[in-house]
């Protein structure tokens, strides 16, 4: 009987390659701590448009704090953010006041850091020195003021549990509200501190 050399060991089959780990949505963080003016809103809208066309994120996550500003600029920014084809997350990083509350409502998800606040109040306007108002001009001004308050009340009522009657009461009070109120009334969904992942893209728009 011939002595046959032992057969070489059969190499193990290549183990299956695991599928790549699922990646979360591409999120870009935008830090905005500033007032709301026509010029600043134009810059912010331009930045958002450029991010969408060049980086194509799935989520824009705003760390947002503002003491308000121009009503028309704020409503324009709200409508612009609502129109974007991606998710908007708003996170109150300090204080959301006046028309900034409307912009905050553009978030499909809304959070607030501990110790942050919200301030709801009515609209005020400043007149230039020696401005003269006749009856018709005064009526026109008052009508525009009422329409702006109606728009603000409608947006907030449509995105929270607050009724328009409650919102108009807040306009008269001009009162700062805590996070318990914000949670109860659906202004926010959660109280949590912001946490930006390591390596995330963050843009600060704290403009001069």
Model region roles, listed by residue range:
Residues 1-208:
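N-terminal organellar transit peptides
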């Amino acid at each position: 009987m011939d002595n046959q050399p032992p057969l070489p060991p059969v190499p193990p089959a290549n183990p299956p390659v695991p599928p790549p780990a699922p990646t979360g949505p591409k999120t870009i963080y935008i830090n905005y701590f500033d007032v709301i003016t026509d010029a600043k809103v134009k810059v912010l809208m331009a930045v958002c448009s450029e991010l969408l066309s060049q980086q194509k994120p799935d989520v824009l996550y705003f760390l947002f704090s503002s003491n308000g500003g121009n009503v028309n600029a704020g409503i324009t920014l709200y409508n612009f953010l609502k129109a974007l084809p991606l998710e908007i997350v708003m996170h109150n990083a300090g204080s959301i006041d006046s028309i900034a509350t409307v912009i905050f409502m553009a978030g499909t998800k809304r959070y607030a850091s501990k110790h942050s606040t919200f301030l709801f109040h009515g609209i005020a306007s400043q007149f230039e020195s020696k401005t003269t108002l006749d009856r018709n001009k005064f009526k026109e001004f008052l009508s525009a003021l009422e329409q702006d308050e109606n728009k603000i009340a409608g947006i907030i009522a449509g995105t929270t549990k607050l009724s328009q009657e409650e919102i108009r009461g807040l306009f008269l009070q001009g009162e700062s509200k805590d996070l318990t109120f914000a949670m109860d009334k659906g202004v926010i969904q959660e109280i949590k501190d912001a946490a930006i992942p390591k390596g995330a893209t963050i843009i600060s728009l704290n403009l001069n």
